[in-house]
C-alpha cells in the first residue's frame, strides 16, 4: 500500500480561525479527517505532520526519504523565501507536490513566487482541500518515484 506524507507548514494549525475569507472555516483536523477517508477509499496510507518551525519541516523531509512514496507539502509562507526548505526538497529522491489552499498568484505580490516550485514535481494552488486529494491521486496514478 502506498504511503504518503502530508506535510503542513506554518500557520496551517490555525485553519478555521486565520483569515476565514481566504482559507474557509474548516480546521486542520477537518482536512486530515477528509484526507484519511479519501485515502481509505483508494487504499493509501497517509501520515500527517504540521510544524510552524522551518527546521522541523526540513528534518521531516530528510527522514521521509526512507519511509514514504511521496510527499504533499504545503509550505505556507515558507514557499516564498525558504531556500533551506527548497534545498531539503531538492536533496531527497522521492517526489514532492507543493500544495496551497489559496491561489498565491491572486493575492499579494510577495506571494507570487515560490522558491519550492522549481524543485517540486508539481504545484497545485487555489483548490482548497481538493488540491491535497489531487496530489494524493497523482501519486496513486504514477509508478515513478
Swiss-Prot record:
Give the top-rank taxon of the lineage listed in the UniProt record for this protein.
Bacteria
The protein in question is named 3-dehydroquinate dehydratase
User: Quaternary structure?
Assistant: Homododecamer.
Task: List the Pfam families hit by this protein, alphabetically.
Answer: DHquinase_II
Positions bearing the site annotation: Transition state stabilizer? 18
Keyword annotations: Amino-acid biosynthesis, Aromatic amino acid biosynthesis, Lyase
The task this protein performs is described as: Catalyzes a trans-dehydration via an enolate intermediate.
Q: Name one GO molecular function term.
A: 3-dehydroquinate dehydratase activity
Which family, according to the similarity comment? Belongs to the type-II 3-dehydroquinase family.
Question: Which catalysed reactions does the entry list for this protein?
Answer: 3-dehydroquinate = 3-dehydroshikimate + H2O
Enzyme Commission number, as recorded = 4.2.1.10
Which GO biological process entries does UniProt record here?
amino acid biosynthetic process; aromatic amino acid family biosynthetic process; chorismate biosynthetic process; quinate catabolic process
> Which pathway features in its UniProt record?
Metabolic intermediate biosynthesis; chorismate biosynthesis; chorismate from D-erythrose 4-phosphate and phosphoenolpyruvate: step 3/7
For the ligand (substrate), the binding residues are 74, 80, 87, 101-102, 111
Question: Do you know which NCBIfam families this protein is assigned to?
Answer: aroQ, PRK05395.1-2, PRK05395.1-3, PRK05395.1-4
Q: What class of enzyme is it?
A: lyase
Q: Give the positions the UniProt entry annotates as the active site.
A: 23, 100
Amino acid at each position: 500500500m502506498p504511503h504518503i506524507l502530508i506535510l503542513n507548514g506554518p500557520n496551517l494549525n490555525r485553519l478555521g480561525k486565520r483569515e476565514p475569507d481566504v482559507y474557509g472555516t474548516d480546521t486542520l483536523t477537518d482536512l486530515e479527517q477528509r484526507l484519511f477517508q479519501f485515502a481509505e477509499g483508494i487504499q493509501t496510507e497517509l501520515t500527517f505532520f504540521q510544524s510552524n518551525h522551518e527546521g522541523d519541516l526540513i528534518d521531516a523531509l530528510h527522514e521521509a526519504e526512507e519511509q514514504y512514496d511521496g510527499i504533499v507539502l504545503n509550505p505556507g509562507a515558507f514557499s516564498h523565501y525558504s531556500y533551506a526548505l527548497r534545498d531539503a526538497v531538492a536533496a531527497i529522491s522521492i517526489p514532492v507536490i507543493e500544495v496551497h489552499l489559496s491561489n498565491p498568484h491572486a493575492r499579494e505580490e510577495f506571494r507570487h513566487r515560490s522558491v519550492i516550485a522549481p524543485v517540486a514535481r508539481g504545484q497545485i494552488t487555489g483548490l482548497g482541500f481538493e488540491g491535497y486529494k489531487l496530489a494524493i491521486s497523482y501519486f496513486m496514478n504514477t509508478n515513478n518515484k
